[in-house]
Amino acid sequence: MLAKKLVTAQKRGETRALCLGLGMVACSMMMYFFIGITIVPFYTKSVWTTETICKVLKANIKDKTHCTNSEGSEDEDIFHYPCLQVWVNLTASGQEVMLYHTEDTLERNPKCSYVPGNSENSKEVKARIETIASNFKKYQTFPCYYDPGGMQTNVILSRLYPPKGLLFTFLWPTLMFTGGCLIIVLVKISQYFSVLSARQ
């Protein structure tokens, strides 16, 4: 009687472990799918892939520009901010090009090197942009990214999704997938040895 209870408890534990392993594998596959349709397209779309050295030629704050709080919005709620324009000398080609913060900056406003968030306080934004401009004048040489294919003649300061960041994004689903597969394999091995011991 005790042996039957032990066998029943063992089978329940194996079933739960197997469900856990399958659940981890399923969750990891969903995470892979989510990353594949959200982050990977942005990474492959970016053409600024080669790192080089940029030297600041001029960093000026132009007249205030504006951006709407949402694309296609008919509201008159418009956010104004100083337009910072940074021009640099691209070491790789010797050209004078405009610097943008990230790939997203160019899409949001190609006239400005930095675009703040819409919900930020205007005074804080003005102070931050002035600080950024002074930092560019203080630190005139820094690494930047350019398009080796020549499709984009401008450069960016940092990539939204660099290769290391993309690998780190895939790390957690990979660990979950590996752990789930390991649990399933261990359960199957346990079941195999249980069958062998039952035959003896």
Curated annotation (Swiss-Prot):
Localization of this protein: Membrane
Record carries keyword Transmembrane helix: yes
Extracellular side: 41-166
Spans within the Cytoplasmic topological domain: 1-19, 188-200
GO biological processes: detection of calcium ion
Signal peptide boundaries: none
Naturally occurring in which organism (per UniProt): Coturnix japonica
Record's protein name: Putative calcium-activated potassium channel subunit beta
UniProt membrane topology term: Multi-pass membrane protein
Transmembrane portions of the chain: 20-40, 167-187
GO cellular component: voltage-gated potassium channel complex
Keywords: Glycoprotein, Ion channel, Ion transport, Membrane, Transmembrane, Transmembrane helix, Transport
MF-aspect GO terms: calcium-activated potassium channel activity; potassium channel regulator activity
Glycosylated residues (UniProt): N89
Subunit architecture: Probably interacts with KCNMA1 tetramer.
Main location: membrane
Function: Probable regulatory subunit of the calcium activated potassium KCNMA1 (maxiK) channel that modulates the calcium sensitivity and gating kinetics of KCNMA1, thereby contributing to KCNMA1 channel diversity. Increases the apparent Ca(2+)/voltage sensitivity of the KCNMA1 channel.
Annotated Pfam families: CaKB
Family: Belongs to the KCNMB (TC 8.A.14.1) family. KCNMB1 subfamily.
